[in-house]
């Protein structure tokens, strides 16, 4: 059986603020911002190059704002990605080496959205697999 992850739901307290953060600062593509009915709003955005999107909204059972931890993005060049995110106004950690030097995928940086949902940005290198 083949399965693909389609959407990650992020609980936020202010949809417009989160939409601006993810689309304008982080650089996600806005897929849609719709109101299926008077009590619901669904905003879906996709990271560039990703097949999986994030959804935020109103009237959705998404949990407490800021409760999602450790969503992960993968990039080819972490230094460049960190510089770009920082230049766009995203507070991002220093690059951290979390495994042996040269190990596949051992470099990370971290950021949070305005509600405290946290993200890891991982550099996927061509080093040996563990």
Residue map of PLM features:
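N-terminal beta-strand motif that seeds the catalytic metal site of vicinal oxygen chelate
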Residues: 1-19, 68-71, 122-130
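Core segments of cupin and vicinal oxygen chelate
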Residues: 2-3, 9-52, 87
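Vicinal oxygen chelate
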Residues: 3, 32-34, 41, 73, ...
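Helix N-cap motif at beta-to-alpha junctions
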Residues: 14-15, 75-79
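Short amphipathic alpha-helices within nucleic acid-binding modules
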Residues: 21, 78-84
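Short, charged/polar surface micro-motifs in flexible loops or helix N-caps
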Residues: 48-52, 62-63, 78-80
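Helix-adjacent hinge/juxtasegments
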Residues: 58-75
């Amino acid at each position: 059986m083949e399965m693909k992850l389609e959407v990650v739901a992020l609980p936020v307290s202010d949809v417009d603020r989160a939409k601006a953060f993810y689309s304008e600062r982080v650089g996600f593509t806005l897929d849609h911002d719709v109101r299926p009915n008077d009590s619901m709003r669904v905003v879906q955005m996709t990271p560039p190059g990703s097949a999986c999107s994030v959804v935020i909204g109103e009237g959705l059972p998404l949990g407490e704002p800021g409760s999602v931890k450790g969503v992960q993005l993968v990039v080819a060049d972490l230094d460049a990605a960190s510089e770009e995110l920082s230049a766009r106004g995203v507070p991002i950690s220093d690059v951290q080496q979390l495994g042996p030097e040269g190990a596949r995928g051992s470099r990370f940086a971290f950021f949070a959205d305005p509600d405290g949902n946290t993200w890891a940005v991982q550099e996927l290198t061509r080093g040996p697999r563990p």
